């Protein structure tokens, strides 16, 4: 510790402490908010911050023993009562919200000079940069009227300088006591540690300023936030960059980049001292004095040469983190930042350029690549432009014919034809390092046309899902011409491509996959012996293959000719943006185990020549009319029609092809939906002819019909949500009826075919057992009591219902699944005791009591309810339900005989509903649809015009 303090680099800096108190509340904890990148402080600085926070007066006017004055390069915002310190706004706000529950999350920022109101400190920063660009300091008054934090900003006349635009130092506080902001320099002694890789930029102090004025005292109730020192005559700020001894490996910038340089108004020059540093390798550092601005050369950068700079981007956490990680973003990083920050790419480039100018960072391309390698600890395999000769392919008559073929065989590569070449293709191979695109190395691909030779085995070009190099394997010979700097053995070295599967391995795996998509243990062991892969790798390959077969519908395979075939493994969909020299081509991989007809293949080349599902902006009405009229004539337009549409709609051929493809998909989806509706309607009509719904189909019916009156099946179908199992069942039935062998809508690679066939075989056993309303009632009562019945419960319910044990077990499993997904509508009603009409079990004596009361009064009076409950030992809900059923039966009987005037009047019904709380309506609407109950008085069908009539019970 003593040796550190003897160093010429200061490690103990006086702390500037400002105390702000709220006059109305003095005994509550203090909190502040941060701004700026997160930074770890040395223990000495942290101790100084703590001491200064406890005794602010002790630091005023103090200096170090060595005479070094605080540079005040950064801000440290600390929470007084929990010793939490941070320089990151997001981290400190998270601490406030989680640890201090009385913290107000929505402070208000007011600029009193301009009457400007902002909800966030970023908004106030943007306002200051726009309207107060010449001010160097601001005074903030923080109050908390009506439990709401208000930060008022004023501009003192004595501090106005053209130096720096003030940044708000705190987002807000709870205002109940005092706000302590410690403002300390961030100067950390660089040691040989992995985390101490930072680029320091220090502002030069003006020696003419007295040391005692470095920490002026501020009045209570105000805090003054200052940035920067005195400005020079021309308004420029000198910035010096630390030497290589104070920063270990400037390329590997893991930490924040410290120091800021303001963006001055147009016309004012800005002096920046730039020191271009070569790559620094691991070495021992010797402490030496920090350099001054005079020791480094000055570079004048006119601000007029820099486009408009958006100051609001400085507070964006995504941008700051990306810049701190590496100051030179890649194309992929810029695309990601464009999405998450909503700023255009050009503005992001300007921001990164300005930040590099502020920090004095200027690296050559070689230094950037070297720094990126060291930062990510990744060896980027740069293959020097080998030339691969493809032989024995009938399609290589010209480069134009083979371009699509190469593009399909090389997923993730950009294929183009350079100018001035007769038959060559330029294949740009993007190299990825930890998900970031690195430099691209173009591979010139020589295409030759060789006549067919009898007896030569076909060429199989195999590209696996992780292939980054091209392997062209010929059964007779393998020709590989590489540059002198790399040999063919090194190019195809197994250590480089250890994760790639060979052609023989893929052939064995795909052959087994075509036989069975779910291999057994014996098959997996056989594949491990044949391919040499581990069991885990084999199972993972099968899992990935099944996933792509399910999700990559409509993928195509190509058979170029009789002697050649291309097998392309499925890979994730990746889109690349090539350079301006190469035509923009985006590749989508294909899942190829199915062969298409040659005519279909040719059509696919014309429809989507680059396999890209591209989405375009909305079209004008006249364009849509022209496209719709052409689609009505022919969904697959010819070349002449495409040319006519291009001239008429001013759209590219690619856009027209994409529109037609989407339109065909939409039409196919509508036709499939209609077929499903017709199948469902036929199924329901057949079920009605048989006299009732089958049990399995009834249990799969969704809640669209529940609680509704009987209506035509077409209306019911429009309201239901059909589950996938239901659709499978319907497709199976339609297939059996029409004598077809495959289910419509399912691809040939779908693994659901075998499962669907098994389900069809199990149908007769499941639908043979039908449950009555009483059986379902008993099952539901037990389900409400326990969802996981014991063996005794199963035996009891089997004895009561007469159902076999497998049927009861299956019913409970289906009910638990439906309850988990919120589709068990009757559960809440049974839980409250609201049973369906006709299923209420009442003792004969109690029934006579209720019958006598009903014959006497014709309605249930509220004052007699408790007396009836005591006599019958029934609950009030059950008594009300019995009266509702009784009145419903009488109403239906009156409706059947046509004498509506003999039933209870409207007033009586109103009184009954008032006394009973409209119990029956609640039961009918909130419960699952009930089974139709045969009335005692009549066997005629129910009249659905009655509000209580025609309720259909449905199974769970």
From Swiss-Prot:
GO terms for molecular function: DNA-binding transcription factor activity; DNA-binding transcription factor activity, RNA polymerase II-specific; protein heterodimerization activity; protein homodimerization activity; RNA polymerase II transcription regulatory region sequence-specific DNA binding; zinc ion binding. Keywords: Differentiation, DNA-binding, Homeobox, Metal-binding, Nucleus, Phosphoprotein, Repeat, Repressor, Transcription, Transcription regulation, Zinc, Zinc-finger. InterPro entries: HD, Homeodomain-like_sf, Homez_homeobox_dom, ZHX_Znf_C2H2, Znf_C2H2_sf, Znf_C2H2_type. Widely expressed. High expression in kidney. Expressed during osteogenic differentiation. One of its GO terms (cellular component) is chromatin. Induction: Up-regulated during osteogenic differentiation of mesenchymal stem cells. It is found in: Nucleus. The modification Phosphoserine is found at residues 599, 604, 680, 708, 723, 927, 946. CDD domains: homeodomain. A zinc finger (C2H2-type) spans 77-100, 109-132. Residues 679-695 have a biased composition (Acidic residues). Signal peptide: none annotated. Residues 42-58 have a biased composition (Low complexity). GO terms for biological process: cell differentiation; negative regulation of DNA-templated transcription; negative regulation of transcription by RNA polymerase II; positive regulation of osteoblast differentiation; regulation of transcription by RNA polymerase II. Residues 666-677 have a biased composition (Basic and acidic residues). PROSITE patterns: HOMEOBOX_2. Residues 22-66, 598-618, 666-695, 890-956 are annotated as: Disordered. Residues 303-502 are annotated as: Required for repressor activity. Pfam families: Homeodomain, Homez, zf_C2H2_ZHX. Residues 304-363, 494-553, 612-671, 764-823, 835-894 bind DNA. Homodimer (via homeobox domain 1). Heterodimer with ZHX1 (via homeobox domain 1). Heterodimer with ZHX2 (via homeobox domain 1). Heterodimerization with ZHX1 is a prerequisite for repressor activity. Interacts with NFYA. Belongs to the ZHX family. Acts as a transcriptional repressor. Involved in the early stages of mesenchymal stem cell (MSC) osteogenic differentiation. Is a regulator of podocyte gene expression during primary glomerula disease. Binds to promoter DNA. This is Zinc fingers and homeoboxes protein 3. The gene is ZHX3.
């Amino acid at each position: 510790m003593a040796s550190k303090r003897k160093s010429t680099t200061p490690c103990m800096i006086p702390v500037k402490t400002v105390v702000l108190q709220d006059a109305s509340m003095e005994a509550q904890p203090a909190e502040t908010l941060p701004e700026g990148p997160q930074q770890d402080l040395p223990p000495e600085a942290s101790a100084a911050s703590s001491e200064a926070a406890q005794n602010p007066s002790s630091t005023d006017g103090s200096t170090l023993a060595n005479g070094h004055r605080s540079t005040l390069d950064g801000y440290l915002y600390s929470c007084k009562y929990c010793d939490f310190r941070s320089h990151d706004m997001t981290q400190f706000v998270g601490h406030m919200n989680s640890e201090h529950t009385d913290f107000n999350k929505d402070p208000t920022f007011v600029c009193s000079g301009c009457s400007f109101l902002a909800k966030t400190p970023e908004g106030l920063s943007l306002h200051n940069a726009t309207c107060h660009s010449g001010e160097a300091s601001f005074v903030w008054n923080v109050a908390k009227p009506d439990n709401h934090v208000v930060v008022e900003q004023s501009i003192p006349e004595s501090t106005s300088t053209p130096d720096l635009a003030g940044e708000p130092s705190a987002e807000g506080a709870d205002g109940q006591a005092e706000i302590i902001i410690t403002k300390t320099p961030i100067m950390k002694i660089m040691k040989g540690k992995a985390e101490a890789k930072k680029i320091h930029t220090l502002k030069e102090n003006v020696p003419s300023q007295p040391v005692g004025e470095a920490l002026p005292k501020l009045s209570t109730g105000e805090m003054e936030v200052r940035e920067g020192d005195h400005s020079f005559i021309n308004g420029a700020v000198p910035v010096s960059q630390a030497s290589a001894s104070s920063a270990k490996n400037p390329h590997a910038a893991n930490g924040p980049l410290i120091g800021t340089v303001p963006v001055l108004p147009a016309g004012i020059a800005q002096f920046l001292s730039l020191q271009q540093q070569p790559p620094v390798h691991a070495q021992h550092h010797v402490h030496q004095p920090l350099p001054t601005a005079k020791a480094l050369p000055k570079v004048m950068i006119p601000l007029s040469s820099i486009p408009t700079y958006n100051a609001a981007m400085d507070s964006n956490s995504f941008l700051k983190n990306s810049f701190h990680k590496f100051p030179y973003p890649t194309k992929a990083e810029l695309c990601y930042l464009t999405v998450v920050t909503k700023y255009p790419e050009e503005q992001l480039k300007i921001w990164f350029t300005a930040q590099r100018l502020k920090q004095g960072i200027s690296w050559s391309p070689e230094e950037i690549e070297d720094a990126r390698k060291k930062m990510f600890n990744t060896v980027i395999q740069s293959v020097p432009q080998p030339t691969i000769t493809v032989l024995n392919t009938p399609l290589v008559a010209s480069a134009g014919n083979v371009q699509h073929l190469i593009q399909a065989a090389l997923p993730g590569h950009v294929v183009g034809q350079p100018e001035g070449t007769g038959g060559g293709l330029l294949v740009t191979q993007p190299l990825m390092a930890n998900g970031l695109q690195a430099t691209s190395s173009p591979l010139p691909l020589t295409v030759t046309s060789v006549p067919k030779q009898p007896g030569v085995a076909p060429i199989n070009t195999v590209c696996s899902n992780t292939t980054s190099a091209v392997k062209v394997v010929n059964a007779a010979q393998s020709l590989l011409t590489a540059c002198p700097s790399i040999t063919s053995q090194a190019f195809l070295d197994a250590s480089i491509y250890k994760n790639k599967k060979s052609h023989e391995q893929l052939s064995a795996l795909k052959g087994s996959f075509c036989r069975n998509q779910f291999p057994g243990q014996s098959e997996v062991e056989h594949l491990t012996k044949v391919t040499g892969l581990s069991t885990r790798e084999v199972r993972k390959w099968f899992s990935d293959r099944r996933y792509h077969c399910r999700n990559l519908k409509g993928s195509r395979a190509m058979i170029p000719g009789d002697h050649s075939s291309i097998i392309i493994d499925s890979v994730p969909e990746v889109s690349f943006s090539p350079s301006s020299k190469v035509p923009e081509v985006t590749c989508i991989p294909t899942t190829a185990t199915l062969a298409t007809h040659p005519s279909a293949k040719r059509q696919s080349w014309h429809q989507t020549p680059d396999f890209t599902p591209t989405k375009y902006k909305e079209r004008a009405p006249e364009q849509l009319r022209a496209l719709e009229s052409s689609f009505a004539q022919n969904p697959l337009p010819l070349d002449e029609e495409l040319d006519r549409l291009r001239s008429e709609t001013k759209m590219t051929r690619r856009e027209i092809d994409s529109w037609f493809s989407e339109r065909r998909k939409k039409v196919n989806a509508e036709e499939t939906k209609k077929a499903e509706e017709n199948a469902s309607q036929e199924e329901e009509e057949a079920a009605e002819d048989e006299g009732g719904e089958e049990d399995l189909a009834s249990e799969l019916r969704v809640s669209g019909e529940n609680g509704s009156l009987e209506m035509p099946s077409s209306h019911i179908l429009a309201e239901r949500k059909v589950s996938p199992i239901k659709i499978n069942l319907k497709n199976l039935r339609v297939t059996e009826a029409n004598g077809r062998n495959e289910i419509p809508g399912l691809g040939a690679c779908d693994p659901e075919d075998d499962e669907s066939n098994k389900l069809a075989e199990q149908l007769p056993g499941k639908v043979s057992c039908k449950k009555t309303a009483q059986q379902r009632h008993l099952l539901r009562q037990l389900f409400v009591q326990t969802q996981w019945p014991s063996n005794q419960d199963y035996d009891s319910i089997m004895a009561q219902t007469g159902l076999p044990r497998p049927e009861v077990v299956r019913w409970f499993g289906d009910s638990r699944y439906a309850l988990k997904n919120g589709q068990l509508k009757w559960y809440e009603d049974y839980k409250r005791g609201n049973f369906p009409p006709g299923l209420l079990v009442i003792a004969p004596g109690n029934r006579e009591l209720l019958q006598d009361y009903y014959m006497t009064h014709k309605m249930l009076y509220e004052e007699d309810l408790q007396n009836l409950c005591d006599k019958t030992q029934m609950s009030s809900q059950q008594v009300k339900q019995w009266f509702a059923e009784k009145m419903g039966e009488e109403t239906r009987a009156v409706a059947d005989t046509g004498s509506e005037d003999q039933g209870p009047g409207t007033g009586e019904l109103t009184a009954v509903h008032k006394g009973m709380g409209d119990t029956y309506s609640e039961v009918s609407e909130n419960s699952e649809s009930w089974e139709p109950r045969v009335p005692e008085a009549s066997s005629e069908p129910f009249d659905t015009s009655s509000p209580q009539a025609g309720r259909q019970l449905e199974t769970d």
